Every structure is written in C-alpha cells, then in structure tokens.
Amino acid sequence: MYLLVNFIVALAVLQVQAGSSYIPDSDRNTRTLQNDLQVERDGKYRYAYETSNGISASQEGLGGVAVQGGSSYTSPEGEVISVNYVADEFGYHPVGAHIPQVPDYILRSLEYIRTHPYQIKDYYTGELKTVEHDAAAFNVYTRNIQDHTIPQSRPSTTPKTIYLTHPPTTTSRPLRQRRALPTH
C-alpha cells in the first residue's frame, strides 16, 4: 500500500513538471530585440522592451507618484492588442481599442441625473429640499439640536402588547400544583 501511494505521488509530480514546461511553438525561438532600463537617483525611471514574437512594453514615471506607458501583443486570433495608460493621483486610465466603452444610454442617464437634482420632503417641516448627488443627501436627515421646530404630526409611540402564543394564565399557582396528583 505504501509503495502504491509513493508511486501515485511521484506520477503526480512528474505530470505537474511536464505540464509547466510546455511552450507554444510560436514562442520557442523568441528573442529579446530591445531591453532598456534607466533609473535615476530622484526616483524617475524608464524601461522598454520588445521581443521577436511581437510583445512590447514601455513605461516611464516617478516611482510611487505617476507613471505612463503602454504594451502590445498579438492575440491568438491575429489581432494586435495595444494598451496605453496613465496612472497618477486620479487613478488608472487605460486606453485601447479592445477596452469596452461606456454605452451612450449610460452617458445620457448620468447627464439627466446631473441636470435634474433629487428632491426630498423634510419629515419635520414638510419642505421640499434639493439634494446634491453625494454625501449631502444624508445631511437632510440630520437636525441641529438648537433648532426648535415642532413637528406638525408625529406617529404614535404608545407600546402595544402583542402575545406571540397565548396570553398569560390568570392562576397564580405553579404548574406542578395545578396538575392533579395521580391517585392509586
């Protein structure tokens, strides 16, 4: 049994090693055509590389602050995929023909939302208030303690008793005493 387990483990290890060494025929003889790297003392850097199978990339910037660059490769379908990007304090902004664009109906709805602000009726005053589309929407519900506005109507806060099963028994004797003792 021990020999069988060792054999299965060895076979699994060989299978993993054989699977990880596979290189497509188109990439077996790939050579690096260009490989440049420049790093300066102030943190600025620039690198670029290109391979014989059509993969290329370049990037430059100031480490941890802002970078810009791009890369390209040929897809299995033969289409050249190219991405250019900028990454800075405003985020990562990729540009490429293969990246989906925001549909027109979404852009139109965002414009409509921007030009037609949301209005909320104040619970206490009944006044309609325009709300900006950010955290200010929650400020409508916060009230100043020094504001002595009296609510016009208030819902009843009187507690009601609700029995989930049966109402309590009216007898004051414990359950043991209420049971009749068995007679023999």
UniProtKB/Swiss-Prot annotation:
The keyword Signal applies. Residues 175-184 have a biased composition (Basic residues). It holds the Pfam family Chitin_bind_4. Residues 147-160 have a biased composition (Polar residues). Residues 147-184 are annotated as: Disordered. Residues 1-15 form the signal peptide. PANTHER family: CUTICLE PROTEIN (PTHR10380), CUTICULAR PROTEIN 65AU, ISOFORM A-RELATED (PTHR10380:SF237). This is Pupal cuticle protein. It comes from Drosophila melanogaster (Fruit fly).
